[in-house]
Curated annotation (Swiss-Prot):
Keyword Transcription regulation among record annotations: yes
Oligomeric and partner information: Interacts with NAC030/VND7.
DNA-binding region of this protein: 112-168
GO cellular component assignments: nucleus
Record's keyword terms, sorted: Activator, Cell wall biogenesis/degradation, Developmental protein, DNA-binding, Nucleus, Transcription, Transcription regulation
Superkingdom as given in the UniProt entry: Eukaryota
Name by which UniProt lists this protein: NAC domain-containing protein 105
Nucleus found in the keyword field: yes
Species this chain originates from: Arabidopsis thaliana (Mouse-ear cress)
Family affiliation: Belongs to the plant vascular related NAC-domain protein family.
Length: 292
């Protein structure tokens, strides 16, 4: 048997690759097989699918010496019961199970056949273990009046293994080397040192920071910090200089200028007050590093 397989492989020219379409499998190869006509290049073997295991198809259906990922063969449907229409798809090691809906095969807008998908399961139904082996079974819908009745049961098959995808490692959304701490820990060392060390003396500026640290422990740091960042002036760029006004200024424009100047002074004073909180916050960091 091996000698026959070797002679069969040698008859295939080097570099030959067999990749027929669904239409070609049904409209040419299967049609000629049912009609018992000669096929120009006989590269599709006859296999009794239900007397062979799927992993043996690679050697039995090899075409030439090129590496293959698909294997083609003719098979004859074996009825499960003599008077029934159900097909027997059991092998020694398992069984083939149909899955999904059959797909129509058209040639020049004419329905010529259907494609059925089969999956191989190890063991016995209904407790079989699903494998990666899949078969596309093509059967003809055309009438073959001149063909013997026994030839109507031929199908052409494409066997292949389902590609297994390797899961890729998800990117981490955070860097484990970075430290994370909440706002309350920023001033906590300074407050803890004052509570646990009786000899600790704080300057008036440090005492003010300690009082603010107590507010942080009570969850009041957000309101203190938001006083600085919630101001609309904080995110605005400095205003451009306005063009010089005409020499003649009406009393209304003078009043508007005085009001604008007064508002700018109040806004500037508010910005200074807001910045003091941030300055105190930054100063606390230098104090903590100095104490260490």
């Amino acid at each position: 048997m091996m000698k026959v397989d070797q002679d069969y492989s040698c008859s295939i020219p080097p570099g030959f690759r067999f990749h027929p379409t669904d239409e070609e499998l049904v409209g040419y190869y299967l049609k000629k097989k049912i009609a018992s006509q000669r096929i120009d290049l006989d590269v599709i073997r006859e296999i009794d699918l239900y007397k062979i295991e799927p992993w043996d198809l690679q050697e039995r259906c090899r075409i030439g010496y090129e590496e293959q990922t698909e294997w083609y063969f003719f098979s004859h449907r074996d009825k499960k019961y003599p008077t029934g229409t159900r097909t027997n798809r059991a092998t020694v090691a398992g069984f083939w199970k149909a899955t999904g809906r059959d797909k129509a095969v058209y040639l020049n807008s004419k329905l010529i056949g259907m494609r059925k998908t089969l999956v191989f399961y190890r063991g016995r139904a209904p407790n079989g273990q699903k494998s990666d082996w899949i078969i596309h079974e093509y059967y003809s819908l055309e009438s073959h009046q001149n063909s013997p009745p026994q030839e109507e049961g031929w199908v052409v098959c494409r066997a292949f293994k389902k590609r297994t995808t390797i899961p890729t490692k998800r990117r981490q959304l955070w860097d484990p080397n970075c430290l994370f701490y909440d706002d309350a820990t920023l001033l906590e060392p300074l407050d803890k040192r004052a509570r646990h060390n009786p000899d600790f003396t704080a300057t008036p500026f440090k005492q003010e920071l300690l009082s603010e640290a107590s507010h942080v422990q009570d969850g009041d740091f957000g309101s203190m910090y938001l006083q600085c960042i919630d101001d609309d002036q904080f995110s605005q760029l400095p205003q451009l200089e306005s063009p010089s006004l005409p020499s003649e200024i009406t009393p209304h424009s003078t009043t508007f200028s005085e009001n604008s100047s007064r508002k700018d002074d109040m806004s500037s004073e508010k910005r200074i007050t807001d910045w003091r909180y941030l300055d105190k916050f930054v100063a606390s960091q230098f104090l903590m590093s100095g104490e260490d």
